[in-house]
């Protein structure tokens, strides 16, 4: 998959974990996983990777929601997710399917959906609600290129892909970058350097986890593996500390 630096698919889910949230039928016109405090004035929007609303990102949202936050995970792909054949296509048909899927995940196609999600959150939680957002892989790209990103007070990016230093010049809030060993370090450094002149740089956080693979906080997280579990939990703890500044 051109948006991912590795060719592995989604990992098996944690069967022993019981989700704490619920599916809502219509947030921004999409089915959405919600977890957390309904009356919270601090809301986070989670933007999935190409594997959709995986159980892993729902479990991560539950971890964040245990701390007085309200978390919304909209299904921006409407149930359509990347298959392993799209990740590593072998045949002409598989390559064509990947090309069509890549067209569907073009960031500008999802900006209007994101705007509708924000509007619904403001309707539910009030105009004075504080909104942050976090995304995985491709989802991080959508967030940092969103034209109305000033509505976000903070943006978290886990194993971000498709990094372009030009994007950094248009981000108007602190960011938290949690990168894996698979992201190109030169691309990460170029993005960070482009952001250094931002007044929000001093409040931002960048860390690369050299033992972790691309996707360790999302659908590629193998939570039966002790080391992946350790860094999965640590990643969400870092996100929580970053977003707690909104309180």
From Swiss-Prot:
Pfam families (UniProt xref): DLH
Entry's Gene Ontology cellular component terms: cytosol; nucleus
GO MF: hydrolase activity
Species this protein is from: Schizosaccharomyces pombe (strain 972 / ATCC 24843)
Protein name: Uncharacterized AIM2 family protein C977.15
Family to which the UniProt record says this protein belongs: Belongs to the AIM2 family.
Keywords in alphabetical order: Cytoplasm, Nucleus
Subcellular locations according to the entry: Cytoplasm; Nucleus
């Amino acid at each position: 998959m051109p948006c991912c630096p590795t060719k592995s698919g989604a990992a098996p889910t944690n069967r022993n974990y019981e989700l704490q949230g619920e599916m809502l039928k219509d947030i921004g016109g999409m089915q959405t996983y919600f977890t957390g405090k309904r009356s919270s004035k601090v809301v986070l929007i989670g933007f999935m990777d190409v594997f959709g609303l995986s159980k892993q990102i729902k479990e991560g949202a539950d971890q964040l929601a245990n701390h007085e936050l309200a978390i919304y995970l909209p299904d921006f792909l409407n149930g359509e997710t990347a298959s392993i054949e799209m990740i590593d296509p072998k045949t002409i048909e598989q390559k064509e399917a990947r090309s069509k899927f890549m067209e569907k995940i073009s960031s500008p196609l999802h900006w209007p959906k994101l705007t509708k999600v924000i509007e619904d959150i403001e309707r539910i939680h009030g105009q004075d609600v504080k909104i942050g957002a976090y995304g995985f892989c491709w989802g991080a790209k959508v967030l940092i290129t969103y034209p109305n990103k000033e509505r976000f007070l903070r943006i978290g990016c886990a194993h971000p892909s498709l990094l372009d230093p030009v994007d950094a010049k248009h981000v108007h809030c602190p960011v938290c970058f949690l990168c894996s060993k698979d992201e190109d370090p030169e691309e990460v450094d170029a993005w960070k350097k482009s952001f250094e002149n931002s007044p929000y740089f001093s409040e931002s956080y960048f860390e690369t986890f050299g033992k972790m693979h691309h996707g360790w906080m999302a659908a590629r997280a193998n939570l039966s593996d002790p080391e992946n579990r350790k860094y999965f939990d640590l990643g969400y703890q870092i996100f929580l500390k970053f977003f707690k500044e909104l309180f």
